[in-house]
Amino acid sequence: MANPIQEILEKQVLTVAKAMEDKIDDEIASLEKLDEDDLEVLRERRLKQMKKMAEKKKRWISLGHGEYSEIHSEKDFFSVVKASERVVCHFYRENWPCKVMDKHMSILAKQHIETRFVKIQAEKSPFLAERLKIVVLPTLALIKNTKVDDYVVGFNELGGKDDFSTEDLEERIARAQVIHYDGESSSLKPKSTTQVRRNVRQSARSDSDSE
């Protein structure tokens, strides 16, 4: 006797497969309707997109994207966040948890050239640590357009242990849309709670006023 559940599952799989096949057929039919002029327009558009992306990558690399580097002063921090649209900054001290974070940050810096990945020693940047309320180390400040948009504090959101994967950290950073991410994890759905934002530009002005 056939298993009714199995039959239902098979029907669902066939339905999905048929829908995908129909979609592909429609796309092929659309392409077949294009004449040479239409194809040339698509080709030119694609070339422009590729050229624009190549120019972006060249600029990102010139700014230090693609590698995980250390910021040695608070002044340099402000220069970095003003130069790059997206920055992930690791506030650290010389301890094991921060070294674990360093390992994952180094990997992500190479994978996400669109974002600048840096670190700064918290104890040597007291103004920033106080202004951004950095208490637990490691803490990642996720920065967009000079604003600290979100934080990853310690390992609590990464399973609470130091054996989390680079993908776990990647997904967490992607929630703040500080990196481009093509994954399908449900954890990337935007949070409903309002994130506290601190304007780094305001911090920079305050820093200048305190001198």
Curated annotation (Swiss-Prot):
Leader sequence segment: none
All copies of domain Thioredoxin, residue ranges: 68-178
Which residue ranges does the record annotate as region Disordered? Answer: 184-211
Q: Which InterPro entries match?
A: Thioredoxin-like_sf, Thioredoxin_domain
Compositional bias (Polar residues) spans? 184-203
SUPFAM superfamilies noted in UniProt:
Thioredoxin-like (SSF52833)
Q: Which CDD domains match?
A: Phd_like_TxnDC9
What is this protein's name? Answer: Thioredoxin domain-containing protein 9 homolog
This protein's species is Arabidopsis thaliana
